[in-house]
Amino acid sequence: MALLTAETFRLQFNNKRRLRRPYYPRKALLCYQLTPQNGSTPTRGYFENKKKCHAEICFINEIKSMGLDETQCYQVTCYLTWSPCSSCAWELVDFIKAHDHLNLGIFASRLYYHWCKPQQKGLRLLCGSQVPVEVMGFPEFADCWENFVDHEKPLSFNPYKMLEELDKNSRAIKRRLERIKIPGVRAQGRYMDILCDAEV
């Protein structure tokens, strides 16, 4: 399995509200772990957005291509740098409805356009369709770091300090997500009534 470089993880899972110079693009990455209920070895991999295919759609296509045994249950855990956009939320819900032998859990480092109504609706749709969406905390960042990152090369930073900082930053994002899950709740001091049609 291909692994992320430590620097890619450090940059792309960075959940600070504002970036410092030099600026860099925050890409959409999805790391997944598929664990059979029978205790077999988990399958892992990752995807990033392509020009005409979001990482979530690449993930769905990959799982479909595996020809999984539908008489067996599987736990699927996904770690994303950005929460799914509204379009991908619908695709994920349809996918899980058609594959009820899969239990999917989504953990995101950051919330994608969280102030926009379509994205809020997408997150609520997922949570209401037995696809829990949560913000990554220390356990999820640590698990992602351990299982999806190449640790062979020397590091230019302290990984434990990085994980602690990610966990600290995630607390405000978790509160934001909890407000989104409840329609009509005030967010950032104002009603979340901004219309936004932006998509990547």
UniProtKB/Swiss-Prot annotation:
Q: What is the effect of changing S129R?
A: Resistance to ubiquitination and degradation by an ECS complex hijacked by HIV-1 Vif
Which UniProt keywords are given for this protein, alphabetically ordered?
Answer: Antiviral defense, Coiled coil, Cytoplasm, Hydrolase, Immunity, Innate immunity, Metal-binding, Nucleus, Ubl conjugation, Zinc
Q: In which tissues is it expressed?
A: Expressed in lymphoid organs. Also detected in non-lymphoid tissues including lung, testis, ovary, fetal liver and skin.
Chief site of localization: cytoplasm
Locations listed in the record: Cytoplasm; Nucleus; Cytoplasm, P-body
Per UniProt, what does mutating R176E do? Increased DNA deaminase activity
What is its EC class? hydrolase
The answer to whether keyword Hydrolase applies is yes
GO BP terms in the entry: clearance of foreign intracellular DNA; cytidine to uridine editing; defense response to virus; DNA cytosine deamination; innate immune response; negative regulation by host of viral genome replication; negative regulation of single stranded viral RNA replication via double stranded DNA intermediate; transposable element silencing
Q: How is it modified after translation?
A: (Microbial infection) Following infection by some HIV-1 strains, such as isolate BRU/LAI, can be ubiquitinated by a cullin-5-RING E3 ubiquitin-protein ligase complex (ECS complex) hijacked by the HIV-1 Vif protein, leading to its degradation. Ubiquitination by the ECS complex is however less efficent compared to APOBEC3G or APOBEC3G.
The effect of R110E is: Decreased DNA deaminase activity
PANTHER family for this protein: DNA DC-DU-EDITING ENZYME APOBEC-3H, MRNA EDITING ENZYME
Q: What else is known?
A: APOBEC3H from old world monkeys has retained its antiviral activity, while it is lost in other primates.
Could you tell me what this protein is called?
DNA dC->dU-editing enzyme APOBEC-3H
* Organism placement in taxonomy: Eukaryota, Metazoa, Chordata, Craniata, Vertebrata
